[in-house]
Amino acid sequence: MSLSDNFADSLISAPPIRVICLVGPTGAGKTAAALHLARTFGGGVVNADSRQVYRDFPVITAQPSPEERAVCPHLLYGFLPSTEKISAGVWTDKATVVIEELCREEPGHNTSRQATSRPDGLVPLLVGGTGLYLKTLLDGIADIPRVDPAIGARLERECDALGAPALHARLASIDPDYAARIHPNDRQRAVRALEVHEGTGHALSWWHARPVPRPRYAALRIGMDMSLDELTPRLDRRIDLMLEAGALDEARAARTVCDDPAAPGWSGIGCAELYRYLTGELPWAEARLLWLRNTRAYAKRQLTWFRADKRIHWVRPDDLDAMAALACAFLRGETAE
């Protein structure tokens, strides 16, 4: 039995731990909001972004800077090599452990916690735009049976031969709901969804809709309220800032560690486009345009996912006082979520 299994068992009769989630599309200001709440209440940040787990791409995936990390503990950022896959289940196991660690940790000198009824320990702040990760952690997810690894290996070979868009098209005919949530070039998720369907006889979205155990956390969900039209110029500017911060050099260095475009770490938006530029597949103007276009499309999918969750409190990213008021009431137990 793993440490996370032991922890989950211990929560069966315990009151749920209160966590705060900051969600929304990429580039909307989740990091700044998290740092404000961390300073206000004494919090620690847990990454809930599937691309920010990769250590070779801190700039391109917009991981918090060293200065931002100095404000409070930041967990589950940049801990995986580019060659290693991660799933919602694996992330949930790791997040379960670090949330427990935060609940035992004392606030540092950079925080000035407002009075709440919360016991000692840091407030877990789950920050990111990977909706499935948060759904798996907070709502639970059906226990998908183990699939024969040979199926996944064969699908990986097919992806090498045909390309990720071909597998995505196949997935769309089998599981249109899940296919609509992922990018056509998202090799890892397309292969996983096809693998589950072939190995279990059911689509991944069918498994995700199965009844699940009682949630282990009470969660306040705060969404960054920004339209796609507002977000687009911010995303364009953010690409410029990433380039100024060394995104191209970062991609060149990452190739010396892993020069396989099919590796999970290279699947992130920005990473894939820069790889194609560095290998001469795309001219610079086309690579940058594709980077922005794919980022915008991803933000649109994120907005669709999160807008469907009626538990989310939508707040303008610059209205930090409103976020703090929601968090204060939640931590005092005045609101359920």
From Swiss-Prot:
Site (described: Interaction with substrate tRNA): 130
Q: Which GO terms describe its molecular function?
A: ATP binding; tRNA dimethylallyltransferase activity
The residues that cross the membrane are none
Q: Where does the chain bind substrate?
A: 26-31
**Known EC number:** 2.5.1.75
The GO annotation for biological process reads: tRNA modification
Please give the residue ranges the record annotates as the region Interaction with substrate tRNA: 49-52, 188-192
Q: Where does ATP bind?
A: 24-31
Q: What is the role of the protein in this entry?
A: Catalyzes the transfer of a dimethylallyl group onto the adenine at position 37 in tRNAs that read codons beginning with uridine, leading to the formation of N6-(dimethylallyl)adenosine (i(6)A).
**Subunit structure of this entry?**
Monomer.
Q: Which family does it belong to?
A: Belongs to the IPP transferase family.
Check the record and name the PANTHER family matching this protein.
Answer: TRNA DIMETHYLALLYLTRANSFERASE
Q: What is this protein called?
A: tRNA dimethylallyltransferase
Organism of this sequence: Nitratidesulfovibrio vulgaris (strain DSM 19637 / Miyazaki F)
The gene behind this protein is miaA
